[in-house]
């Protein structure tokens, strides 16, 4: 790659990073063909403070410092149980703001791509629920389940739909409600201190100036490490709901998210830098 291309990719990376780390600022990103409007608009209203996260770590100062130092986490937002917020409702809130900031009407949306691994239902997916709740005409809705990289995959799908001329305005949503399914004891601290609840949305639209654009998208996977970050149950291949109910095993951890934190962190740092640079 030329130095100009490397700088371009780094610029995109930092703009996306800014989007996810500055939740209260409206943002407009110019990627050429596509104009990317977005805002992290919906966050869980209950938050876990530094003190609560430390308690989850067993009040072990060194372990707590390690988590904070490596992740930068100071608090985690969680949806208040019983208040009615779901992955879909947070996505709808974010989508409304993204559509408004894009300066278009909801009926100008041609397609919806929704990325999540914590859907309201096993099926149907949240894409059609958003389409219904926004009152958008019967446009297509696609759900993406690619874990932490789901929003990146969703953006890449929207990019291709726009470049091929199939759609003009694609609504992309990333929303997660993890807190209701996390092990909040010290046993689950490796995962629970990291994940929170929130949603972000973007509208990708075609512009007449086609001299710019997303130059390329690089998507990779390493399936040999799939179980290092996984949620095994319920699943048709291993443990279904009836298995969990019948066993009634309080020590069963298969229905909680699992992460080999050290392995995932090291692999992510190496692979992510390889792709970006």
Question: Predicted regions span which residues?
Answer:
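Conserved alpha/beta core of the MobA/IspD/sugar-nucleotide pyrophosphorylase nucleotidyltransferase superfamily
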Residues: 1-24, 29-31
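Conserved catalytic cysteine-centered active-site region
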Residues: 64-89, 117-170, 175
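Phosphate/pyrophosphate-binding loops at sites that engage ATP/ADP/AMP, CoA/4′-phosphopantetheine
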Residues: 94-110, 275-277
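Internal, well-ordered alpha-helical segments in soluble enzyme and binding-protein domains
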Residues: 5, 126, 150, 154, ...
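Condensing-enzyme catalytic core mediating Claisen C-C bond formation in acyl metabolism
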Residues: 28-84, 186-270, 274
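Flexible, glycine-rich active-site loops centered on histidine and acidic residues
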Residues: 163-199
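Short glycine-/acidic-enriched loop or helix-start segments at secondary-structure transitions
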Residues: 123-124, 182-184, 226
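Buried hydrophobic positions in well-ordered alpha/beta secondary-structure cores of metabolic enzymes
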Residues: 2, 67, 98, 109-112, ...
């Amino acid at each position: 790659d030329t130095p100009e291309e490397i700088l371009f990719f780094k610029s995109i990376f930092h703009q996306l990073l800014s989007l996810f780390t500055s939740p209260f600022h409206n943002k407009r990103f110019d990627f050429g063909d596509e104009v990317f409007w977005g805002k992290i608009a919906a966050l869980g209203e209950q938050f876990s403070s530094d003190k609560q996260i430390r308690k989850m770590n067993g009040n072990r100062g060194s372990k707590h410092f390690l988590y904070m130092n490596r992740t930068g986490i100071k608090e985690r937002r969680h949806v208040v149980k019983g208040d009615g917020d779901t992955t879909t409702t947070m996505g709808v809130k974010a989508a409304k703001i993204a559509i408004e900031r894009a300066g278009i009407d909801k009926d100008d949306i041609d397609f919806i791509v929704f990325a999540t691994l914590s859907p309201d239902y096993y099926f149907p997916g949240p894409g059609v629920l958003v389409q219904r709740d926004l009152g958008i005409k019967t446009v297509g809705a696609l759900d993406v389940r690619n874990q932490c990289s789901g929003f990146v995959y969703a953006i890449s799908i929207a990019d291709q739909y726009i470049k091929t001329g199939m759609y003009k305005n694609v609504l992309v949503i990333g929303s997660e409600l993890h807190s209701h399914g996390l092990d909040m004891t010290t046993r689950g601290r490796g995962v629970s201190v990291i994940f929170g609840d929130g949603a972000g949305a973007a509208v990708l639209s075609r512009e007449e100036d086609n001299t710019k654009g997303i130059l390329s998208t690089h998507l990779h996977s390493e399936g040999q490490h799939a179980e290092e970050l996984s949620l095994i149950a319920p699943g048709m291949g291993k443990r279904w709901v009836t298995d969990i109910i019948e066993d009634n095993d309080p020590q069963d951890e298969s229905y909680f998210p699992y992460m080999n934190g050290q392995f995932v962190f090291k692999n992510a740092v190496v692979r992510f830098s390889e792709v970006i640079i």
